[in-house]
Amino acid sequence: MTSKTIRIMIVDDDQDLAESLADLLQAHGYDVAVAKDGQDALEHARGEDFDMTLMDVRMPVMNGVDSFLAIRKIKPQARIVMMTGFKEPILERAISAGAEGPLHKPFSLDDLLKLFETIH
């Protein structure tokens, strides 16, 4: 029996953070894609399937909440966890529409690995 590799998309305009996080997760056996903003995430979601997406809230071009709502229109079952380092009033729009989280920055690798254990 083969086990499926878990696919994660990290969406954050802080590319150093996103790439570091991707490297850590890849070292733990996850297949990781990185998107630089909400619009880039939407393009990834149109062409690929992910088991979970970690989405920053504050980003240029398209913020995380708008990206979440757009992705949910094309992939209603998408699991998207909102990440933020701030108290975000707009976050409630995403949470009430089914987003998971928020995952508050800074978070630990252990926090993420526990979150990923919920992926079936």
Regions found by a protein language model. Give the residues of each.
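Alpha4 helix (beta4-alpha4-beta5 surface) of REC/receiver domains from two-component response regulators
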Residues: 66, 86-103, 114
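Short amphipathic alpha-helix used as the core "switch/output" element in two-component signaling
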Residues: 43, 65-77
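Acidic catalytic/metal-coordinating carboxylates
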Residues: 36-40, 63-66
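Non-catalytic signal-transmission and effector/linker regions of two-component phosphorelay proteins
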Residues: 1-7, 110-120
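Two-component/phosphorelay signaling modules centered on CheY-like receiver
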Residues: 15-33
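Receiver (REC) domain active-site loop signature in two-component systems and cognate sites
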Residues: 59
